[in-house]
Amino acid sequence: MSEKHPGPLVVEGKLSDAERMKLESNYLRGTIAEDLNDGLTGGFKGDNFLLIRFHGMYQQDDRDIRAERAAQKLEPRHAMLLRCRLPGGVITTTQWQAIDKFAADNTIYGSIRLTNRQTFQFHGILKKNVKPVHQMLHSVGLDALATANDMNRNVLCTSNPYESQLHAEAYEWAKKISEHLLPRTRAYAEIWLDQEKVATTDEEPILGATYLPRKFKTTVVIPPQNDIDLHANDMNFVAIAENGKLVGFNLLVGGGLSIEHGNKKTYARTASEFGYLPLEHTLAVAEAVVTTQRDWGNRTDRKNAKTKYTLERVGVDTFKEEVERRAGIKFEPIRPYEFTGRGDRIGWVKGIDDKWHLTLFIENGRILDYPGRPLKTGLLEIAKIHQGEFRITANQNLIIASVPESQKAKIETLARDHGLMNAVSAQRENSMACVSFPTCPLAMAEAERFLPSFTDKVEAILEKHGIPDEHIVMRVTGCPNGCGRAMLAEIGLVGKAPGRYNLHLGGNRIGSRIPRMYKENITEPDILASLDELIGRWAKEREAGEGFGDFTVRAGIIRPVLDPARDFWE
């Protein structure tokens, strides 16, 4: 990134209303406890509507029936989304059985949704079941604290089934970082777990009384796999190993994908390299990055509040030097690392510990019993007999991890019998969408419900041009907030209106380049016509091993985004 003209360290001006809300919330309590007992509405009112996000929930409604209910003079069918805190995506089979039961008994949709932030979500929790879901999670050692709003969100960690020892070490650091950066308020325990109020003053030594200016995302990544899409995240620890043992991390700061349609002050940005740090400085550096963003992030304009904008305003070097000062270290030069891919290896892989790992492709992460494919039942049956753990991947898939040779055949039989190992194309394996309609209030266009049939059509184009076994990293996101990570795809569709998308092209397979908008506000037939032409050219003109995104840049079809603060919108 270029150093333009470093701006002020702190943005002066009228604070956004979110800052007032946080300050007046009494460390995230608000009047949530009282609101829970209000049976006149299925939702949360006033500030509580936003405060529940700090407790891992979003208030939603079923948009498919919103107009129908309005015509009947009924309020929207309010229900909550709850997102679990699950560092590194590791969940025990006991925990899985508990969440399976809750989804079946206490949610409108009966499904478990794996997310590309390596955790699971429940959709459709009615207000009466909100407290029980938190208590259920607590009973099996889980919680939903800090999985939404202005905190450090769920910490990702590469789901690496090969280097078992290295994964174990990296995963422990993901957990340590997650715990270190958690809020200290007792609001969560008091409201949801009925723990007594303690007569002490709440303090937030890391996050502060008004928490962070905006959401903050952290990863621990083990090269050569970039499955966690580090450039979508504020703070990234890239594992550096010697002789198979973790010795330290390269730190990259300031990635982020969300934009606002037409707002040229917003842009997607890849993360900047700060340097290498030995393991013993990890928590101090993590805290220093977070507190620097806490103090310097823009609290007057939430559209410009993320770390990526702070870096561009103050300058990368200035931010880095402040992190060094706060952490009491000097970064060493970046150590060599390389990424070769970011997809999951579907199927069986043997780890170096002689245990087997079975990665199951779960289209769009939606676990439900479909006609002829009872996925949810199948995973429950596996959970009942499996001695190891499950790992949720950042590609919305699920790994049955650490399977001994003696159990391999039984687990494979269960998986096959329940439609969990059906053959799918490489293209489908490398396609992903956010939830969008009907539950997301921000959705502008379909995503999860659109992608399967759209993928069928892209597969047909690949077949037509003689490359059916090829794949293009393809993502669909229902709005420009970018949960589907379309801004790191080779083909990225960003919802603009019902049935209409902005088409972005020119990302790469390893997720290190932002795609540029190729066509704006177009329909599915227009998108497919463009892809038919370009994929045809790629099939004929590509160099050996050249991915679709790299081809579009080399062929001059797309001008690469090199400095997004300056050229993202050009």
Swiss-Prot record:
One of its GO terms (cellular component) is sulfite reductase complex (NADPH). It catalyses: hydrogen sulfide + 3 NADP(+) + 3 H2O = sulfite + 3 NADPH + 4 H(+). PROSITE patterns: NIR_SIR. The keyword Cell wall biogenesis/degradation does not apply. GO terms for molecular function: 4 iron, 4 sulfur cluster binding; heme binding; metal ion binding; NADP binding; sulfite reductase (ferredoxin) activity; sulfite reductase (NADPH) activity. Its EC number is 1.8.1.2. Pathway: Sulfur metabolism; hydrogen sulfide biosynthesis; hydrogen sulfide from sulfite (NADPH route): step 1/1. It holds the Pfam family NIR_SIR. Gene3D superfamilies: Sulfite Reductase Hemoprotein, domain 1 (3.30.413.10). It is an enzyme of class 1 (oxidoreductase). [4Fe-4S] cluster binds at C434, C440, C479, C483. The keyword NADP applies. One of its GO terms (biological process) is hydrogen sulfide biosynthetic process. Keywords: 4Fe-4S, Amino-acid biosynthesis, Cysteine biosynthesis, Heme, Iron, Iron-sulfur, Metal-binding, NADP, Oxidoreductase. Its cofactor is siroheme; [4Fe-4S] cluster. Binds 1 siroheme per subunit. InterPro entries: CysI (IPR011786), NiRdtase/SiRdtase_haem-b_fer (IPR005117), Nit/Sulf_reduc_fer-like_dom_sf (IPR036136), NO2/SO3_Rdtase_4Fe4S_dom (IPR006067), NO2/SO3_Rdtase_4Fe4S_prot (IPR045169), NO2/SO3_Rdtase_4Fe4S_sf (IPR045854), NO2/SO3_Rdtase_FeS/sirohaem_BS (IPR006066). Siroheme binds at C483. Alpha(8)-beta(8). The alpha component is a flavoprotein, the beta component is a hemoprotein. Belongs to the nitrite and sulfite reductase 4Fe-4S domain family. NCBIfam families: CysI, PRK13504.1. Component of the sulfite reductase complex that catalyzes the 6-electron reduction of sulfite to sulfide. This is one of several activities required for the biosynthesis of L-cysteine from sulfate. This is Sulfite reductase [NADPH] hemoprotein beta-component. It comes from Salmonella newport (strain SL254).
